Amino acid sequence: MICEVRGQRLHHAAGAGSQQGLDLIAKVLIDEGSRVLVETPTYLGALQAFSPMEPEIVSVASDDEGVDAADLRIKAGSGADAARFVYLLPNFQNPTGRTMTEARRAAVAAVAAEVGLPVIEDNPYGDLWFDAPPPASLASRNPEGTLYL
C-alpha cells in the first residue's frame, strides 16, 4: 500500500501512461498461449502491447451498451482454462467511442468478481465528461479484482 485516502487503502504505481501500463501488465500476466479477453473491437495499442507475449486473444461480444456479461462469463473459462484477464475501455471506448452503461458495468463487474477474472480497466478518456458526471468505474465496483489505468 502506498497511500490511504478517506479510510480506503489504495495501491498505486506511477508510470508514463496507460500504454506503458499495458506493456508492464502484458509482461507480468501473459505467458505464451494464455488467453486474454478483449472487447470487439478493441484498442489497437493494447493488442500491440499484448502480442509480443504470444497470447490467444479472444473477443467478447459487445453492443451499444458495452461488453455482453453473459458472453464474458462463458469466455472467462475456469481452472487451467481460465483467461488471464479481460481488457476493457468502459468510457469513450477506442475505436467505437461508446460508453458502457451503468447496468452493463454492474453486470460485468459482478461476473468478473464471481468467476475471479481480473479486469484491466483502461480509462484514458475519463476526463472528457463535460455535461454530466462520469459513471462509476469498474474498479469502484470490484476494487480487489481490477487494475485501473
Question: Can you name each region flagged by the protein language model?
Answer:
Residues 38, 120-121:
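Hydrophobic residues in beta-strands of the RecA-like P-loop NTPase core, especially within AAA+ ATPase
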Residues 1-115, 127-147:
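Conserved core of the PLP fold type I
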Residues 122, 149:
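Active-site glycine-centered loops adjacent to acidic/histidine catalytic or metal-binding residues
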